Structures are given as C-alpha cells and as structure tokens.
Amino acid sequence: MNEDEIQIPKVGEKYYHFKHDPLLGADNHLYEIVGLGDDTETGKIVVIYRPVYESKYLTEKGAEYFVRPLSVFLDFVDREEYKGPRFYKA
C-alpha cells in the first residue's frame, strides 16, 4: 500500500491487529475506532480504539480504550513471522 492508498480510520470502523488469529474467533484482536484525538504533548493525531473482545489487559489497568499515534496505527510491521500493516480493516 502506498501513501495515496492510506485510509484514515473513521469512527465505527473495525480493524484487526496483525496478531489476529481467525482460529481463535472472529473477535480475536478486533477493534472498533472510537475517534481521533490530539496529543497535546506532541501535537500529533492519535487513534482511540476499543477492543470488541474482553481485554484482560485493559481491565487490569482500569481503562476502556487503547490510544496510538496515527502514524503507528497506520505503520507496517516487518517481522520474520509477519510483514504487513499493523492494523487492517475488518
């Protein structure tokens, strides 16, 4: 995917994280976009998203949402076991 094809996530859209394993169910690592925000410390746009599945990680922290810089959300992963977008539209 090149820069011209990059789609900014929109509220309500659902994305899979690259760690999604369809064998573990359709909701495994599935997230819904809650909104975009402004990181007042850096001035960068962030993506606010929530898991569609029950996240023990967030529950233990007492949080409801994940937040990532837009650039990281749209980034590509380059690992031995996976090369591709960090998140992809469901």
Language model features with spans:
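Short beta-strand-centered aromatic/proline hotspots
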Residues: G25-D38
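Short aromatic-glycine motifs in intrinsically disordered, low-complexity regions
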Residues: K10-G25
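Mixed-charge, Lys/Arg-rich low-complexity intrinsically disordered regions
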Residues: M1-V11
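Basic/aromatic-rich interaction segments and small domains that mediate binding to polyanionic partners
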Residues: G35-L70
